[in-house]
Swiss-Prot record:
Keywords: Isomerase, tRNA processing. Belongs to the tRNA pseudouridine synthase TruA family. It is an enzyme of class 5 (isomerase). NCBIfam families: hisT_truA. This is tRNA pseudouridine synthase A. HAMAP family: TruA. Homodimer. One of its GO terms (molecular function) is RNA binding. The active site is at D52. Its EC number is 5.4.99.12. InterPro entries: PsdUridine_synth_cat_dom_sf, PsdUridine_synth_TruA, PsdUridine_synth_TruA_a/b_dom, PsdUridine_synth_TruA_C, TruA/RsuA/RluB/E/F_N. It comes from the Bacteria. It comes from Dinoroseobacter shibae (strain DSM 16493 / NCIMB 14021 / DFL 12). It catalyses: uridine(38/39/40) in tRNA = pseudouridine(38/39/40) in tRNA.
Length: 257
């Protein structure tokens, strides 16, 4: 049975997360409903990551097995037609081998978090950024972030409901970009790792925001990390600024031939 990889973009605001839920709308549910328009008996899809309620994606990847050997372009066009008006888009489809798995074949996931410092409400970016009103020191946040790079026990920075077997993860990158915006400043946090713990990114960004605001010293991040205690974490920031940006594989399934 032909297997296809799908690159998916979505606005997470109206959804209870990626994962299919019985009583609430989900991104997985929307994509699977679109697939049923093409093949009513399809077996469902598997994704690279299960984003939480309100979290967005620029490059989520999922795979599906279909009875028909679709032309990838026609498959993406057909799915987008069935997805309307949901804020979900299939950016690309690709024929992949039967050993490809969207989750288990992934080498790296990258996330983007958008934080807007502005007293005025975010109008055009409402629901797409986390807005705070206090000024932030980007150099202090960068200094605090250095303590988190590398392989660590991230118990402090994961949800108490996290189901991962181990809290040990290797964080390959945290970079913070600062750029002026009308009546404010936007900070973009870029994080890369093979995989992340539940709420890890939001816990890290929420903690670094406290460093930027002057409520924490940069070295307090190291102390919190070494505590291996969820109670030592800073506040978990709002989900609407978080984006699953990209998923990397040994070979890019969407690379043009």
């Amino acid at each position: 049975m032909p297997r296809f990889a799908l690159k998916i973009e979505y606005d997470g605001a109206p959804f209870a997360g990626w994962q299919r839920q019985r009583e609430q709308p989900s991104v997985q549910g929307a994509v699977e409903a679109a697939l049923r328009g093409l093949q009513p008996d399809h077996a469902g899809i598997a994704a690279a990551g299960r984003t939480d309620a309100g979290v967005h994606a620029l490059g989520q990847v999922a795979h599906v097995d279909l009875a028909r050997d679709w032309d990838p372009f026609r498959l993406s066009e057909a799915l987008n037609a069935h997805l309307r008006p949901a804020p979900v888009a299939v950016l690309a489809a690709a024929r992949v081998g039967e050993d490809f798995h969207a989750r288990f074949s992934a080498l790296e996931r990258s996330y983007l978090f958008r934080l807007l410092v502005r007293r005025a409400p975010a109008t055009h970016d409402a629901g797409l950024v986390w807005r705070v009103m206090n000024p932030l020191d980007v150099e202090a946040m960068r200094e605090g972030a250095k303590y988190l790079i590398g392989k660590h026990d991230f118990t402090t920075f994961r949800s108490t409901m996290c189901q991962a077997a181990s809290p040990v993860k290797t964080l390959d990158e945290i970079t913070i970009e600062e750029s002026p915006r009308d009546a404010g400043t936007e900070f973009r946090f870029h994080l890369r790792a093979r995989s992340f713990l539940h709420n890890q990114v939001r816990s890290i960004v929420g903690t670094l925001e406290r460093v930027g605001a002057g409520a924490w010293d940069p070295a307090d991040v190291k102390t919190a990390l070494e505590a291996r205690d969820r109670a030592a974490c800073g506040p978990v920031c709002a989900p609407q600024g978080l984006y699953l940006r990209a998923v990397r594989y040994p070979e890019d399934p969407f690379k043009p031939a």
